[in-house]
Curated annotation (Swiss-Prot):
Transaldolase is important for the balance of metabolites in the pentose-phosphate pathway. GO terms for biological process: carbohydrate metabolic process; pentose-phosphate shunt. It catalyses: D-sedoheptulose 7-phosphate + D-glyceraldehyde 3-phosphate = D-erythrose 4-phosphate + beta-D-fructose 6-phosphate. It comes from Mycobacterium bovis (strain ATCC BAA-935 / AF2122/97). This is Transaldolase. The keyword Transferase applies. Belongs to the transaldolase family. Type 2 subfamily. The active site is at 143 (schiff-base intermediate with substrate). GO terms for cellular component: cytoplasm. It is found in: Cytoplasm. Gene3D superfamilies: Aldolase class I (3.20.20.70). InterPro entries: Aldolase_TIM (IPR013785), TAL/FSA (IPR001585), Transaldolase_2 (IPR004732), Transaldolase_AS (IPR018225).
Length: 373
């Protein structure tokens, strides 16, 4: 039996599920994903359009399959659908032991709906159901963005008995709406006769992008007080989100009534945890966000940083809400418009994924054209 890295094992023991924010066929074929499971405590995988775009643009791993699809006359969308769902299905199969050992809580792989549908409720619902059927694995998560149009889609998809990873959450206010959408979906699933214990969900709360946007604005203000607040907003925001999570899933009658029928909590998932500012510790968004019943999905670079020098000191979130609120009060007092910050981040988040999707379309089209020659 291969030994787990002690730092990552300590993180897991503190209640944080370690997920890898990356997937490629090379990673699957080389056994690297299995190696990360065996040595770095990885118990889940998240993907997004940027990750697939990167996977397809590097090397020739997908050439043979794309040539075969081209010969069958597959168009670009069908090709992307086949290639990405094949990888996700394979990753689901690799993670079955973790799924079984955790009673379905971990061992999860996430695939995102087409980001061009971020503002279209009905089409999002339709595609989520299609992806669920195509991958056909019980340990799949369908990723749906927490846009205004995404919220009713989240409820509708959960009501079908499908597990959902809600993505692109930036503000605590929107996170509360996400938890409400989860509870609504579970209530509908109960009415439809689904087994609630089999429906799982996580809420992906983005961390580093909040610091990137707010730090930019603090630098523009330039006062000593402003500069002292740099690098604090991302962690403070996530800590306030965790306090909101506890309110709903530990104290609300609405969740209690679902729990009696087997409903699980919707766990907070810390996303965007790769540190973008070299002035900050490269494990900042891991060591400062340790709390029970959470997930931290990390790029491999961050997993390696935690493995090498991450100091895990137990729960660093519970009981921090008043200090976190103080950070936000100070940000407001010096003129940071937080409503605008979160609106910009959501719009930018959708746009980034759309841009990656368009690059993926172009690259796949080029692959198909080459194969057809």
């Amino acid at each position: 039996m291969t030994a787990q890295n002690p730092n990552l094992a300590a993180l897991s023991a503190a209640g944080v599920s370690v997920w890898l924010d990356d997937l490629s066929r090379d990673r699957l074929r080389s056994g690297n994903l299995q190696e990360l499971i065996d040595t770095k405590s990885v118990v889940g995988v998240t993907t997004n359009p940027s990750i697939f775009q990167k996977a397809l643009s590097e090397g020739h791993t997908y050439d043979a399959q794309i040539a075969e699809l081209a010969a069958r006359g597959a168009d670009v969308d069908a090709t992307i659908r086949t290639v990405t769902t094949d990888d996700v299905r394979s990753a689901c199969d690799v993670l079955v032991p973790q799924w079984e050992d955790s009673d379905g809580v971990d061992g999860r792989v996430s695939i995102e709906v087409d980001p061009r549908l971020a503002h279209e409720t009905e089409k999002t619902i339709q595609q989520a159901i299609e992806l669920w059927k195509i991958v056909d694995r019980p340990n799949l998560f369908i990723k749906i963005p927490a846009t205004k149009a995404g919220l009713p889609a989240i409820s509708a998809v959960l009501a079908e008995g499908i597990s959902v990873n809600v993505t692109l959450i930036f503000s605590v206010q929107r996170y509360r709406e996400v938890m409400d959408a989860y509870l609504t979906g579970m209530e509908k699933a109960r009415q439809a006769g689904h087994s609630l214990s089999k429906i799982h969900s996580v809420a992906s709360f983005f961390v580093s992008r909040v610091d990137t946007e707010i730090d930019k604005r603090l630098d523009r203000i330039g006062s000593r007080q402003a500069l002292e607040l740099r690098g604090q907003a991302g962690v403070a925001n996530a800590r306030l989100a965790y306090a909101a999570y506890r309110e709903v899933f530990e104290d609300s009658d609405r969740y209690r009534s679902l729990k009696v029928d087997g409903a699980r909590v919707q766990r907070p998932l810390w996303a965007s945890t790769g540190v973008k500012n070299p002035d900050y510790s490269d494990t900042l968004y891991v060591t400062e966000l340790v709390a029970p019943h959470t997930v931290n999905t990390m790029p491999e670079k961050t997993i390696d940083a935690v493995a090498d020098h991450g100091v895990i000191q137990g729960d660093t979130v519970t009981g921090t809400a008043s200090d976190a609120q103080a950070v936000f009060d100070q940000l407001g007092a010096i003129g940071i418009d937080l409503t605008d910050v979160f609106a910009v981040l959501e719009e930018e988040g959708v746009r980034k994924f759309e841009a990656s999707w368009n690059e993926l379309l172009q690259e796949t089209r080029a692959h198909l054209d080459t194969a057809a020659q």
